[in-house]
């Protein structure tokens, strides 16, 4: 392991860590947290952001463009995995992947990442170092391979900076909420954040996160999301999925959270 300081990072170094499934993650010394589950970065990403929310089936169906918004670009694994799945499925529709990252890592650090996967295109191995090598504050847009309609729209800065000015050509289909925990990063887990998601999406949008605390579920419910418990990844008992109250995409095999009670607890000031 070696410390690497980000070009924008004022929060101290990060360390490379090999997780138990053979994939790379990082450990933030400032937040005192891993970027992914140390039991398996790739495995966690697959379950939380592609399997549990039905995105794998949507990609395989190849029935239109897909728009994803991610809070916390981190190592870029979720973008890389989404691109891989689109190419592997020979899905010729566009993928627009929006993400926010306040403290991007260096391209040198990204160049050392390893994953136990055979990428759909070998060039995928070079995409992340290329992304991290050319970042500016604000919006950065990349099309890593002109032969595929795969676009990364990466905002370097804080989510609050774009909440009131976000302009999209198409509503968001899937939300990947992958910020550091509510204990370490509470500003990313408020009803205001989840209301922005609500406004940027559509009736069938789906929100997924690795977290399961009552506080974050209450914030979602307060923003008019219908919240569900889902089995957690790699030793975690639960994770969280959410959809619009009248969505046709409501998961039928999951347990709904007590949404009204959570909403009342939030507005009652339990976490203020």
Predicted regions located by residue number:
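SAM/dcSAM-binding transferase cores
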Residues: 2-3, 12-17, 143-148, 238-272
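A short glycine-rich, Lys/Arg-flanked "PGG" loop and its adjoining helix->strand segment in the class I
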Residues: 187-204
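Conserved Class I S-adenosyl-L-methionine
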Residues: 217-238
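N-terminal auxiliary segments of SAM/dcSAM-dependent transferases
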Residues: 1-35
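The AdoMet/dcAdoMet-binding core of the Class I SAM-like
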Residues: 55-170, 191, 223, 233-234, ...
